[in-house]
Amino acid sequence: MSAPVEVVLSADSAGQLFNCAVYDPHTGSEFLSYRGGNTSSRSLTILNGEYILGAQLGKNYINVWEIQRKDQLQQKIVCPGIVTCLCASPDGLYVLAGIAEAIYLWEVSTGNLLAILSRHFQDLSCIKFTDDSSHFVSGGKDNLAFIWNLSSVVQLDSSRTPEPRHILSRHSLPITDIHCGLMGPQARVATASLDQTVKVWEISSGEMLLSVLFDVGIMSVTFDPCEYFLFCGGSDGNIFQVSLCSTSLSRDKTFQSDSEGNQVFKGHRNLVTCLSVSMDGTVLLSGSNDETVRMWDVQSKQCIWTINHRGPVTNAAIIPAPANMFLSDSHPAVPLPRFSRHLNPSEQGDGTGTGGMSLRLGANTQEPEGTYLEKAEELYSLMCAVTDKSVFGDGENTKVRVSELEEEVRTLKKINKDLYEFSTQLLTKPN
């Protein structure tokens, strides 16, 4: 049997049978399960198609599994506090976590903590990257959502405080969910709130494009890939489908079921915590506190299949099937380093850095450090001077110094070659 194009990934708060599991989106049959702990809401993410990360419910660490080694919990990433939301960038270079009212940004290649963003006034509830990893959006219990430009966050030196690109402040109660559409910095983002509204914004301008008012608080939200419809999960168990192509659509709208695409999916008996649409837009996945995950046909609004969990569903999504998921003999290309709990320790010189290659962009340094190749050429010139002019004196001391320099040149050339090969693999790796 060929590997599926998409799979369903879900988790519940009980964790009695497994932490999270992978299912066939067509039949609902289980493919794989990952054991150890239980994952909190909005805190299950795939890192670079090679790892599954899940924040432990009520604890200050993140569980990590290699994606093809389902029966063994690989490691635990200890965090400065309880993680309330978690997201890995689609390009696999960064990990974001909401801890209390702060956003923590880690660099995956080194494990360095690059930034702590403390603009929210209350705990974070959700955080999402755009599809091109250029921006991320955070939402919290303070009724605020912030749009952040990733490059501006990682470029800033420690003497400057990163600022969000836009502040979205139209909600009057806590934000419960965020969904970013396609098109990177030109995308639209939807925010759901307990104030019974879902609002659609433009990332580039921060302008509100649409506000839809419902009769109940909204716990989850998503678009279909073409953004024909907006799907909103209510606290009463209903899922509301809002047509974004309706001729009667206005900026401020009250939801009413009609014949123009505004419809209701009925079946859940408790609040809907998760929503996700397949890449072709034909099926909708939902997870609920009624301990079920359901797959719906978008056109007919009928439930195709149901998966029963042992506790309230905290995470459920339709995701592209990672290439390594069904290959038992495959391994991650790069080991996952230990994540630091302090801001960029390699720069602070506390000796806790991993020594890996840093991908931090545009660091503000007065005297940029030379490349390994430049260092090697400089050492080679120095060796020639030693040989020709006996800079370090005559006899045995000169020979020892020359040997040391030759060894250092060989080491630097090897490091430069390894860096080049790693960068080439990273840039040519298919998405």
Swiss-Prot record:
This is WD repeat-containing protein 18. The gene is wdr18. Keywords: Cytoplasm, Developmental protein, Nucleus, Repeat, WD repeat. WD repeats lie at residues 78-118, 119-158, 170-211, 213-252, 267-306. Residues 342-363 are annotated as: Disordered. GO terms for biological process: determination of left/right symmetry; DNA-templated DNA replication; Kupffer's vesicle development; rRNA processing. Involved in left-right determination through controlling the correct clustering and migration of dorsal forerunner cells (DFCs) and Kupffer's vesicle formation. Component of the PELP1 complex involved in the nucleolar steps of 28S rRNA maturation and the subsequent nucleoplasmic transit of the pre-60S ribosomal subunit. Pfam families: WD40, WD40_alt. It comes from Danio rerio (Zebrafish).
